[in-house]
Design a protein with these regions (language model features):
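Gly/Gly-Pro- and Ser/Thr-rich, intrinsically disordered tail segments characteristic of DNA damage-repair
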Residues: 86, 123-132
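Alpha-helix capping/helix-boundary segments
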Residues: 109-110
């Protein structure tokens, strides 16, 4: 392994923390504005479904991120058994040698081991630890924690109170977007019971999102009187969290890091949401004379295109989760499954300024006349219409449409489009 990489100096402004399930997604998150990225290795992280990193991948990711002044946090947040302790300790040492900026841990034993094995690496307490109060946060601080990732069940008033009662240099991280678990902070046995896949080892089958017909013991043969459709009920199915329009309140409550859930998600999902949340934070800071002023009275207004970004990725019905205590639990239960109104159609590979032709690597079918958008970092999406003529495949032959995934096509485009820009369009 190469020499330990230097860490990145932290920022004072709110941090946009993006997920990465593999090296390609990590680079996308960096390119689209993340201040920090969290990722997990092939072992000891809570997302077995994501294409996790090898140690070599993590090292490459740290190099790429640090070259762009972005921090990298490694998740080691499973709840380990005895047989995993020795391997875990060796893994902590390897991550420290690579130079990750922080370790995200749940288990108290891992926390104490990390203090000894990686004394110069920040320790962040995972949401799996279920930190719900200032006393628990302060105790973890005394044990060496630099940051606590709050349980998703905390409200804004509770976060404000915690911020006021914990040490000033103990940071608060909170999930602001993505999937929520119907169990407390992910402590669920449904997956283990129904499929044998252990959620506490990152292998949740999301059995809670299956369709169920619920029967109560004293009323055999009768559906439990909740909202039930012919296809069943999603009683256990949480809505997705979306706090984009309310980031000013989250920041004002004292949250240091704004976390996007989704280490099992792909490049397009991470690009769109990272870009949206980064734009929202920039809007917030530009509206304040002092970037550390957390008591702004002016109105936080985002451009409409930013507010629409969460609806252009695959999602479930959205809610504000538990941030507002006046909302009932039932308001966070979705009545259906995934919504996929927009598709990632392809990625820009090259633009020829002489011929004004754009080359794209396709992912989904595109046809002449189709209205699409280019998604690019730090800017509003650019509308575009697939031209009615002049489409060529990778052999240079003229074709009528783009209909082969993972193939390169080119077509006329007057707008200069940089490599890495993503094309998307409404599902047809």
């Amino acid at each position: 392994m190469n020499v330990k990489l230097p860490k990145i100096t932290r920022r004072r402004s709110p941090e946009v923390l993006a997920p990465a399930g593999n090296l390609r997604v990590l680079k996308t998150a960096v390119d689209y504005g993340a201040d920090a990225v969290y990722c997990g290795g092939a072992e000891f992280g809570m997302r077995a479904a994501s294409k996790n990193f090898t140690l070599e991948d993590i090292e490459q990711g740290v190099r790429y991120a640090h070259a762009h002044n972005v921090r990298v946090y490694a998740t080691v947040n499973i709840i380990p058994g005895n047989a995993e302790v020795a391997g875990m300790n060796a893994y902590l040492g390897a991550l420290a040698e690579i130079g990750v900026d922080a370790l995200i841990v749940t288990d108290i034993g891992i926390l104490m081991a990390a203090r000894q094995i990686a004394p110069h690496t920040e320790l962040h307490i995972s949401t799996q630890a279920g930190v719900m109060n200032y006393q628990a946060a302060a105790a973890l601080y005394e044990l060496g924690a630099k940051r606590v990732v709050l349980a998703r069940e905390m409200s804004l008033p509770e976060i404000r109170e915690m911020r006021a009662k914990i040490p000033g240099d103990l940071e608060i991280e909170a999930f602001v977007h993505g999937s929520m678990c119907m169990a407390f902070s992910g402590r669920c046995l449904i997956s283990k019971y129904t499929t044998g896949r252990d959620a506490n080892h990152g292998d949740c089958a999301q059995s809670c999102r299956w369709k169920y017909h619920v029967v109560e013991e004293k009323r055999p043969g009768e559906f439990f009187p909740v909202e039930v459709t012919d296809s069943g009920t999603y009683l256990f199915n949480s809505q997705d969290l979306n706090m984009l329009a309310h980031l000013d309140e989250v920041i004002a409550a004292g949250v240091t890091s704004l976390k996007i859930e989704g280490r099992a998600k792909g490049e397009y999902y991470v690009a769109a949401l990272t870009n949206a949340y980064k734009t929202a934070v920039t809007t917030y800071l530009n509206g304040s004379e002092n970037a550390t002023d957390l008591a702004r009275d002016d109105t936080f207004a985002l451009p409409e295109w930013v507010l629409q970004e969460p609806y252009k990725v695959t999602h479930r019905e959205y809610s504000t989760g538990f941030f507002y205590p006046e909302k009932t639990v039932g308001e966070s239960i979705t009545r259906g499954g995934y919504i996929s109104d927009w598709l990632w159609l392809g990625t820009a590979v090259d633009y020829d300024t002489v011929t004004q032709r754009l080359t794209v690597l396709s992912r989904n079918k595109m046809v002449p006349g189709q209205q699409v958008e280019f998604l690019m970092p730090g800017t509003e999406p650019i509308p575009f219409q697939i031209p009615s003529a002049g489409i060529r495949d990778e052999t240079g032959e003229m074709v009528n449409e783009i209909n082969h995934p993972a193939h390169e096509f080119s077509f006329p485009c007057a707008q200069v489009i940089p490599p890495g820009a993503m094309l998307r369009g409404k599902a047809r």
